[in-house]
Structures are given as structure tokens and as C-alpha cells.
């Protein structure tokens, strides 16, 4: 086992006899709409929050700090823990129908108007859902449904006809954990990379003489 926890086996013996079930999204969950009937005056204040389009578009797992304020409105659909959020339009077909799983328990959380929500009615590992829906095979299925010319849209009803692979819950957990660990490692190394870039930038300024000087600020002994 590698120290970073990323070692895995292809076709582990305990799962060899378990074929993955194929079910339509609409058979294992229900949908709901984002905010409706709002004007720009309704946003930017209030004790509620809504998940932004860019949060859904950019993150397999939604970020709690990428929300914006909105007034509480009990007539609107609320986003709950474990919901999957989908974008409904984009400038290119390859970017339509991007998904994000919401794993926060915050009250009075809503969804922006340019997305729709999906609530599973059977047990899923949320991290499995997050990464499976962004896999290359699923993205091809979703992209195929995109319609438009200058801007592309996707039908919620057609999305619900897409078949998804559903392994046993224990295998889902292992898959979800594996990709979650990968993302954590990527984030860690990205932070290290950013720090090293800052060090390099600083040293480029200090290890060469500035204009008007012939002595650098920092030099080797």
C-alpha cells in the first residue's frame, strides 16, 4: 500500500462477480427547478443563500463559500445534502449539463435559475455520484443531448433518460474515496506549487540588481 493511500487493484476479487446495474436517472431520483420569479433586487441580501452557476459548473462537489445571499422564500425549492445540481446551458455543447453534488447541511439554501436539482431516491455514495457524473463516458452521453447554435441547452427530461452505472454501495464508497483522495492531493500540491512560484518570483527580484544598483539584495556567500 502506498503511503499516500492511492493504491488500488483493478477488478478486486470481492467485486469480480458483481456486474454494475444500469438505471435511468429518472428511475432513481426526482428533479426540481432553481429559483424562479426573482428580480435582481431580490439578490445580494437576506438570510438565505443560493448556489451559484459557477459553483455547479466548476466543482464536482459544491463549495460552501461559493454561494450568494438571497431572501428566504418558502415557496422556492431548497437544496438538501446529497442533491446533485446540473447546469442547463452553456456556450459550448461540451460544457452543458455539468454536475455538482451538494454536501452541506445549511438551511435555506436555494439553487440559481440556470440549473436544476436532482434528488436521489435510492442510496448512493455522494462522492461516487460526483465523480461518476463527470467521467468521460457520462460526459459524452450528456454532451450528445446538447441542443442550440450560439448557446447550448439541455432538456431535463432527456437527462432523466440517461442510464448511469450503479455498483454495490461498498464499491461506490471505495471509488468515491479514491477520487476524493486524488483531489485532496492535487489541492495540496497546487498549494505547494503556488508557494514555490511566489518564492521564485521574490528571488528573481532580489537576486539580481535593481535598476540604478549594481549589488543584488540577496546573494550567495
Residue ranges and their predicted role:
Residues 14-35, 221:
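Non-catalytic DNA-recognition/assembly elements of restriction-modification systems
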Residues 26-39, 54-84:
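Sequence-specific dsDNA recognition surfaces
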Residues 36-39, 109-114, 146-173:
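A short glycine-rich beta-alpha junction/loop motif
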Residues 58-71, 84-111, 116, 127-131, ...:
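Short, ligand-facing micro-motifs at secondary-structure edges
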Residues 186-201, 209-214:
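Extended intrinsically disordered, low-complexity coil regions enriched in Ser, Thr, Gly, Ala
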Amino acid at each position: 500500500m502506498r503511503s499516500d493511500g492511492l493504491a488500488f487493484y483493478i477488478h478486486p476479487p470481492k467485486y469480480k462477480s458483481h456486474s454494475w446495474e444500469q438505471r435511468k436517472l429518472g428511475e432513481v431520483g426526482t428533479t426540481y427547478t432553481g429559483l424562479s420569479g426573482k428580480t435582481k433586487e431580490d439578490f445580494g441580501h437576506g438570510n438565505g443563500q443560493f448556489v451559484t452557476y459557477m459553483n455547479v459548473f466548476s466543482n464536482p462537489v459544491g463549495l460552501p463559500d461559493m454561494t450568494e445571499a438571497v431572501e428566504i422564500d418558502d415557496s422556492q425549492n431548497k437544496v438538501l445534502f446529497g442533491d446533485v445540481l446540473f447546469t442547463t446551458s452553456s456556450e459550448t455543447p461540451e460544457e452543458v449539463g455539468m454536475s455538482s453534488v451538494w454536501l452541506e447541511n445549511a438551511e435555506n439554501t436555494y439553487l440559481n435559475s440556470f440549473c436544476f436539482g436532482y434528488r436521489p431516491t435510492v442510496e448512493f455514495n455522494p462522492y461516487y455520484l460526483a465523480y461518476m457524473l463527470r467521467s468521460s463516458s457520462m460526459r459524452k452521453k450528456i454532451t450528445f443531448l446538447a441542443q442550440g447554435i450560439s448557446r447550448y441547452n439541455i432538456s431535463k427530461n432527456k437527462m432523466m433518460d440517461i442510464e448511469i452505472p450503479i455498483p454495490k454501495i461498498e464499491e461506490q464508497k471505495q471509488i468515491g474515496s479514491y477520487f476524493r483522495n486524488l483531489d485532496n492531493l492535487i489541492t495540496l500540491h497546487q498549494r505547494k506549487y503556488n508557494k514555490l512560484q511566489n518564492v521564485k518570483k521574490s528571488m528573481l527580484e532580489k537576486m539580481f540588481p535593481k535598476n540604478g544598483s549594481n549589488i543584488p539584495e540577496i546573494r550567495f556567500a
